[in-house]
């Protein structure tokens, strides 16, 4: 698939090839206060324009970290995590077709297409293998990517991922679809914010009020094109398989949920971990479905540890790892 255009902080190379930001020297890597270097590439896959963002600072201690966020996140949603991740490797975030600033994607294109778009990013950047961090809807894309393109994966971390869309959520999606198409942004923003956050009395969640306001404002302030994309996303969810029990590569896997996540519960996370050949399961304490936002530094630390094979035991912010996997001896 052709590259449509390149937007970069560097002058493009003569042949127009896509590149990662250059590797820093050891001395530069030690200066963690140094801002990350950022490059953005505008790409085209199967006729749809989309954008990837690459941030880099420091030595290459592990394979590039590709982050696939939820449907309401975009390539800029993970910038606050980069402080802890860019000293280790490049961090790549993507507005896939149908999301963020990318082209509108009709609902007939499902998870298979989006997984192929992730492969397109990896190939265009010339990366042999990646660490994949995939959250919520990004988790569905990430698992399908692993199933279809296993040779490109080194490790996979799933956040708030399940093998099935919760039944009550599936029913609510049909109602939300109508609300979005009627332009009822404030009611659906309130309902979605309540859905993503754990209900009162579930347990202490850090930054709960602030995160709830953020989610509400983000949804309520969507412009007409963003609302159109949101409606099409709901249609995509209803028309295509969320999870398909296909073979998954035997690579290190980690499944994570918030301790008080009531949307994708810890029990659902354990079921997901049990479907992978080699996986551990953990909860992040005092968080719910939006754990990556509620404990940014701790979540980033967990990603960094997993992607560099450091111990995950005895962490002050998470439960002890539980071992799952289809390749475990009986």
Predicted regions located by residue number:
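Active-site loop/oxyanion-hole signature of alpha/beta-hydrolase fold enzymes
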Residues: 45-48, 53-55, 92-137, 301
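Conserved HGGG/HGGXW glycine-rich cap/lid loop of the alpha/beta-hydrolase fold
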Residues: 48-103
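Conserved alpha/beta-hydrolase "nucleophile elbow" surrounding the catalytic nucleophile
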Residues: 71, 134-139, 258
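Short helix immediately C-terminal to the catalytic nucleophile in hydrolase catalytic domains
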Residues: 142-146
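Flexible "cap/lid" loop of the alpha/beta hydrolase fold
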Residues: 147-148, 154-184
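Conserved alpha/beta-hydrolase catalytic His-Asp/Glu region
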Residues: 167-169, 186-247
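Conserved serine/cysteine hydrolase catalytic core
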Residues: 224-274, 283
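Catalytic active-site module of serine/aspartate enzymes centered on a nucleophile-bearing elbow/loop
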Residues: 279-330
């Amino acid at each position: 698939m052709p590259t449509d255009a390149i937007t970069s902080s560097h002058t493009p190379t003569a042949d127009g090839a896509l590149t990662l930001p250059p590797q820093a020297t050891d001395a530069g890597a030690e200066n963690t206060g140094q801002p990350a270097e950022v490059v953005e590439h505008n790409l085209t896959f199967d006729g749809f324009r989309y954008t990837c963002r690459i941030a880099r600072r420091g030595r290459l201690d592990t394979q590039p970290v590709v982050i696939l966020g939820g449907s309401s996140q975009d390539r800029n949603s993970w910038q606050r995590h980069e402080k802890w991740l860019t000293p280790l490797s490049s961090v790549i975030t993507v507005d896939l077709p149908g999301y963020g600033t990318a082209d509108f994607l009709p609902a007939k294109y499902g998870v298979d297409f989006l997984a192929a778009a992730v492969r397109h990013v990896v190939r265009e950047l010339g990366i042999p293998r990646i660490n994949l961090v995939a959250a919520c809807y990004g988790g569905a894309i990430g698992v399908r990517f692993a199933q279809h393109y296993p040779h490109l994966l080194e490790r996979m971390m799933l956040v708030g991922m399940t093998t099935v869309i919760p039944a009550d959520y599936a029913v609510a999606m049909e109602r939300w679809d109508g609300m979005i198409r009627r332009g009822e942004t404030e009611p659906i923003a309130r309902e979605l914010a309540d859905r993503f956050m754990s209900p009162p009395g579930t347990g202490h969640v850090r930054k709960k009020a602030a995160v709830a306001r953020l989610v509400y404002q983000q949804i309520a302030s969507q412009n007409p094109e963003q609302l159109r994309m949101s409606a099409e996303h709901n249609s995509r969810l209803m028309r295509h398989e969320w999870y398909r029990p296909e073979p998954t590569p035997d690579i290190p896997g980690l499944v994570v949920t918030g301790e008080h996540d009531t949307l994708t519960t810890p029990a659902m996370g354990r079921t997901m971990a049990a479907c992978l050949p080699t996986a551990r399961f953990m909860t992040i304490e005092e968080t719910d479905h939006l754990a990556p936002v509620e404990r940014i530094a701790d979540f980033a630390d967990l990603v960094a540890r997993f992607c560099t094979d450091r111990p995950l035991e005895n962490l002050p912010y998470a439960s002890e790892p539980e071992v799952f996997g289809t390749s475990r001896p009986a």
